[in-house]
């Protein structure tokens, strides 16, 4: 790898390593802290809900700064002490306040980082998928390591994640500097992102699929460890299998994107997620749940690679940070808020997290049926002919 691509890959590895610790075990941290029922749902939903505000604001700020890297450094730097504070909290009120503050910074790291990396790779022969591969490998290894190190002491999770974020801050310092456009004004500003070619149907499909993924990321750890024999260390293996399953697509994803485009590839995601969540709703064995994780490689990573590359190609330079923020706002903030609330309500009413996965089957099937006629009729959406 050339030096800029190597620095970008290092950032990806550190970010997804930190995210493996936080995202994979936050629900177990809350559960071990005595939080359950509606209070657990409120804590889990506050994070994506507040990111609906924070992500577009930081995306806009990044585009207006002389150096776009500064916004990334601020969001990573602020997240570290907030995670440490979360580790000190004992009661629900303190956790709720810190979680809300954390949501103003940490969810913005991924879209800001993606925007900088995609811009850095424009003149590089190294495709984005190869760089993103470092993130999947790191997520797999760190998930396994975190599961083994935490054991049943999930209260230690914030400290472990904060340590990973400290390393990530160093990785962010090494990213190639990218100039913002503080004096460029585009009529309509941030809202112009929604007027980019085919942005609305693509974002609509992503929102539905990410709603289902939001339920998975929030409740899978609780569901898995509730199965007979579903230990914390085995949960780490589940995350490892899921991350490893992303590798084939990341090796081929750039070529597949150019050939089939974002819309058609995400229809494959819709079909795979319908099957995946249908199986998760039915199985009662942790070994079967481990096997189902092999379908993970056709879900999140396909959506994010396709949307990141498409928006990077069609957005003007002064809107690139905002464009990535919109992807994250729609695909994370809005959709995961729905996934956590609706899925949590159903699982609470029926007394089973598996029932929530049944609802997500309906969401993914609706996405597939509703958007297949749209994207199969349109030309290939790869940003070159849009």
Listing of model-derived features with the role each one plays in the protein:
Residues 1-2, 175-206:
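Juxtamembrane intracellular "pre-TM" segments in multi-pass secondary transporters
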Residues 53-67, 150, 248-262, 347-348:
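Helix-to-loop junctions at the C-terminal end of transmembrane segments
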Residues 3-5, 87-99, 281-292:
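Helix-loop junctions at membrane interfaces in 12-TM secondary transporters
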Residues 2-48, 199-206, 210-238:
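Helix-loop boundary and gating motifs at the non-cytosolic
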Residues 148-164, 344-365:
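A membrane-interface helix-boundary motif in multi-pass transporters
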Residues 100-134:
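Cytoplasmic helix-loop-helix junction between adjacent transmembrane helices
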Residues 70-84, 264-279:
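Structural signature of the two symmetry-related core transmembrane helices
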Residues 87, 165-177, 359-386:
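Multi-pass alpha-helical transporter architecture, strongest
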């Amino acid at each position: 790898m050339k030096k800029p691509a190597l620095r970008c890959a290092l950032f990806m590895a550190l970010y997804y390593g930190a995210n493996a610790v936080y995202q994979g075990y936050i629900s177990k941290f809350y559960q071990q802290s005595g939080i359950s029922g509606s209070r657990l749902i409120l804590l889990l939903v506050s994070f994506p809900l507040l990111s609906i505000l924070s992500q577009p604001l930081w995306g806009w700020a990044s585009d207006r700064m002389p150096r776009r890297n500064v916004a990334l450094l601020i969001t990573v730097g602020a997240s570290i002490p907030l995670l440490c504070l979360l580790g000190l909290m004992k009661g629900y009120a303190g956790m709720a306040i810190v979680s809300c503050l954390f949501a103003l910074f940490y969810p913005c790291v991924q879209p800001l980082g993606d925007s900088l990396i995609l811009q850095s790779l424009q003149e590089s022969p190294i495709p984005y998928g190869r760089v993103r591969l470092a993130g999947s490998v790191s997520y797999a290894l760190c998930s396994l390591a975190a599961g083994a190190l935490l054991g049943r002491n999930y209260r230690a999770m914030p400290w472990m994640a904060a340590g990973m974020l400290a390393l990530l801050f160093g990785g962010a310092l090494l990213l190639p500097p990218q100039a913002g456009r503080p004096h460029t004004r585009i009529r309509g500003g941030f809202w112009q992102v929604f007027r980019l070619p085919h942005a609305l149907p693509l974002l609509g499909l992503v929102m539905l699929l990410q709603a289902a993924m939001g339920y998975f990321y929030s409740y899978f750890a609780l569901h898995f460890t509730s199965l007979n024999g579903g230990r914390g260390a085995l949960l780490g293996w589940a995350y490892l299998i899921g991350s490893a399953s992303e590798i084939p697509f990341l090796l081929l994803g750039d070529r597949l994107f150019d050939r089939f485009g974002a819309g058609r590839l995400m229809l494959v995601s819709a079909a795979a997620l319908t099957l995946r969540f249908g199986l998760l709703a039915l199985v009662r064995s942790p070994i079967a749940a481990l096997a189902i994780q092999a379908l993970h490689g056709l879900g999140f990573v396909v959506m994010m690679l396709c949307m990141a590359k498409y928006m990077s190609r069609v957005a003007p330079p002064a809107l690139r940070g905002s464009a990535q923020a919109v992807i994250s706002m729609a695909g994370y903030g809005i959709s995961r808020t729905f996934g956590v609330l609706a899925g949590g309500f159903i699982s609470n009413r029926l007394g089973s997290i598996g029932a929530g996965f049944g609802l997500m089957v309906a969401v993914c099937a609706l996405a597939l049926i509703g958007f297949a006629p749209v994207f199969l009729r349109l030309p290939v959406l790869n940003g070159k002919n849009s």
